[in-house]
Amino acid sequence: MAKMSVVAAALLALLVLGQATAFRTTVTTTLEEEQEENPRGRSEQQCREQMERQQQLNHCRMYLRQQMEESPYQNPRPLRRGEEPHLDECCEQLERMDEMCRCEGLRMMLRRQREEMELQGEQMQRIMRKAENLLSRCNLSPQRCPMGGYTAWL
């Protein structure tokens, strides 16, 4: 009877230990997945480094600046790679960035552009719309980068 109690206690201890290990593994896996999906946190540094390597998306900035100089009343035609100055180079810079950093990179570039050009009101809304759709013009994922409302940039 004493042997049976010892065996039962040992099995119970193994069962509890096994459950604790499985729980810890699940929690660790969940945290790692959240970090991979979230471009903020430690991945934000990676995005900044990629922006540096891609010269702060300078060709995208030049492309958007050129777009702002055109009349907003012109009949817009679909833009494709190879048809617009700086668009090809912008697409190449975005292509060399990780997919999870592309939208954040465009937001960083747009903040800088806003400061340089002192954009506000309708101009800011216009450049935001163009930046939101830049990845689809480059045929890259994600196809669209929401930039938030105009008030988010004030």
Swiss-Prot record:
It comes from the Eukaryota. Residues 72-76, 151-154 form a propeptide. Disulfide bonds join C47-C101, C60-C90, C91-C138, C103-C145. Residues 1-22 form the signal peptide. SMART domains: AAI. Keywords: Disulfide bond, Seed storage protein, Signal, Storage protein. Residues 29-52 are annotated as: Disordered. Residues 37-52 have a biased composition (Basic and acidic residues). The keyword Calcium does not apply. InterPro entries: Bifun_inhib/LTP/seed_sf, Bifunc_inhib/LTP/seed_store, Napin/2SS/CON. One of its GO terms (molecular function) is nutrient reservoir activity. Belongs to the 2S seed storage albumins family. This is a 2S seed storage protein. The mature protein consists of a small and a large chain linked by disulfide bonds. This is 2S sulfur-rich seed storage protein 2. It comes from Bertholletia excelsa.
